[in-house]
Amino acid sequence: MKSIFFDEIDNTQDFAIKEFKEEPLLIASKAQTSGRGTNQNNWQNADQSLATSLVFNKKIVNFTKTLIPLLAGYSYVSLIKNQNLKLKWPNDIIFNDDKVGGVLVEESNDLICIGLGINYFWKNPNLPGAGAIYEEKQDDRKIFQDAEEWGRTILNYIENEDFSLENYMSKLTTLGKLVEYPEGRGWAKDINDDGSLMIETPSGELLNLTSPLISEII
C-alpha cells in the first residue's frame, strides 16, 4: 500500500481515484475544501479531523462487496480501542451518542474507493448531533498513523476474507432499536450475511434494508 499525506486537499476520494496506478493507494489529509459525505452531504471540517481514502482494484475482493462499508467502519473502531466508540448501521461512527465520523464507499470503473472522515477534536461543533473523539488536539502524526493502520487493516481483511459480522455487531448500536426509514418504521433485528439490516415492521413483516437513509428513534 502506498500512502500520501496532505495538510489540506480538495477531496481525498477524487484524488485517490485519479492517482491510482496498480497497488492500493491511501490518501490522508487533515482538511478538505470540497469534501462530501454520504448522499452528497457536504463535508464539515472540525478543529482537527482526518479525511482519508483507500482505493484498490475490485479484483482483489472475493466476498460480498456490500459488506465493505461495515468492514471499513469496524476497522477504524477496532483500532482506536475506546469502548464508547460505536457503529450505527451502515456507515456512521458514534461516540457517546454523537456522530464523530462516517464511511463513504464509491465505485469507479474497476476501482473501489473507501472514504473515512473522523472528527478528532471539535471545541464547538456547529452541527446538531455532531461531536469529536478527543477533548484536546492530538499529535498530527497519530492521525496519519491511524489512517495507515486503518488502510492496512481493511486490506488484511480483504486478503484473508476473515471479516466477522459477529465482531461488527458487538460494536453496533442499531440492533434492538426502533428505526425510521423512508417507507415507515420497524425494529432493527439483525444484520444479514450481505450486510443488509433486517427489521420487523409493526405488522410483524420482516424486511431487509440496504438504504442508508434510516434514523434510530429509541
Can you name each region flagged by the protein language model?
Residues 1, 21-29, 86-89, 151-154, ...:
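N-terminal start-of-chain detector that recognizes signal peptides
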